[in-house]
Structure formats: structure tokens, C-alpha cells
Amino acid sequence: MPKLQHTDWPDRLWVVRHGQSAGNVARDAAELGGANLIDLEHRDADTPLSALGERQAGALAEWFASFNENQRPTHLLSSPFVRAHQTCAAIALHLDIGLDGIGVDERLREKEFGILDRYTVQGIRAKFPDLAEQRALVGKFYFRPPGGESWCDVILRLRSVVEVLRRDHVGDRVVIVAHQVIVNCFRYLLECLDEKAILEIDKLADVPNCSVTEYGFGEGRDAERFALRRANYVPPELAATAEVTVDADTPAGPK
């Protein structure tokens, strides 16, 4: 469990969900049409941002670029999935960091859905009723589809990312661009939550595309405590210039 009272943390950490993807749009269409399968021309890892997602990424990048020089991000880390990397690239260009300044880390990838990949919720119930029943019984935190991951599996790989942040990024200002489940699993780790608490957060609302969950040190008596400062924050630039979307994060399977 992280010791949040210690100062061996980044000065600021922003965990960002990518902009709306073409997969989000395809999933919405499939669910609306009652289809069992989501019609996608790319594998999940190669699914790009939608046109709206590109505008969202640009608005988020403008928000980061508006910071004072001593408050701007110094390091960028990204999921290797195209939609996340495109979002991170927009930030990099606005901060004059350059694309080669993005650290791509496979541990930040989307949760893997295995055999349920590309199926809608209706499709899973129709094609894999036993798995749908098992998920309902076990709960999404522990349920692992064949060939896929549970939330616990995702948390396990993120634990080592947290250790890297504490070892290599003390005093830095770090942006991580990833996926909805990744945002929530970081919250589980960094806020020392349990299954019930994180699932209540997840149930309350989806993480908006290009929203920011921010951690850092406070002031006064709170100056040595690394803690959550705001969650699922939608920057005013995004709210003003692009539609805010809260689509389910994955183009395949239940999140």
C-alpha cells in the first residue's frame, strides 16, 4: 500500500482518460441497434480517436499549455493504444515536448476482454450466458473472462507503475494518458480504496473523455501529503470548445 504521507512522489500527477474513440461511436451504434457484435475495422489497440475525440484532445492540450511554466507537466506517459497515444501527442505538441518525449508503457493498456472482445452486453448474454451469469455472481472486480483480465489483474500491473513513479519521478509533474478502467484502478491504488469503494465510484458515473484526475501535495499542514486533489475534472477549455462525452470506455465487452 502506498505511503501517501511520504514525499517520494511526483509533485503533481494527472491521470487522463483518452478522447472519444471511433470504438466508442461504434459501440453506441451497436447497442442502439440491438446488435450482438460491434462493427469495427481495427483491433482494439489500433482504434483511433473520433473527430470529436481529436477536438477534445486539442482542448485538453490547450488547458495544460495555459499553466505557468513552473506548473506545466514535465513528463508524459501513455498507453500504447492509438486513441490514448493520439491524446497524449496533442498534449506533447502544445507543450513543445515532442512526440519522442512520450513514454509509452504497455502496463497502461486497456483492460483485456479475451473471448468477449467486440461483443455488446446483449451479445454476451446471447452468446455466453454462462459467463454473463458468472460475472453477475462474482462481480466485475474479480471476474476474468477467458483470455482476458479482471480488475485485479489490471491493478497488479499498475502497482509496478506506481513504484516507477515513486522511484524515477520524485518532484516531477507527470501526465498519464490511458483508459477508464486504468483511471479507476489508479484511484484504487493511490487512494487506498477497497472493492466496495471503487465500484461505488465506478457505478456513480463513467469517466468523461479527456477528463483529469489529479494528485499532488497541498499547502500548510497538508504540504507533505500526496493526495487526490480533483477527480474526473473537465477543463473549461474542453467544456467550451468540444462536446463532453462519457461513453463507456471500451469498444468490446463489459468494462
Language-model regions, residue ranges each:
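A polyampholytic, Gly/Pro-enriched intrinsically disordered region
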Residues: T120-A132, G218-P236
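Short catalytic/ligand-binding loop motif for oxyanion handling, primarily in non-cytosolic enzymes
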Residues: A22-V25, R83-T87, K111-G114, V183-F186, ...
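Internal catalytic-core helix/loop-beta-alpha segment
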Residues: R144-R167
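Phosphate-coordination/substrate-recognition cap region in phosphate-metabolizing enzymes
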Residues: P2-P10, W14, R55-E133, K196, ...
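An N-terminal RHG(E/S)-centered segment typical of histidine phosphatases
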Residues: M1-T74, A89-I97, D222-K255
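Short glycine/proline- and acidic residue-enriched helix-loop micro-motifs
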Residues: D39-P48, A132-C152
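Active-site-adjacent alpha-helix immediately C-terminal to a catalytic or transition-state-stabilizing loop
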Residues: H85, L99, R159-R225
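Beta-strand elements within well-structured catalytic alpha/beta cores of enzymes
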Residues: R12-V16, L77, D172-A178
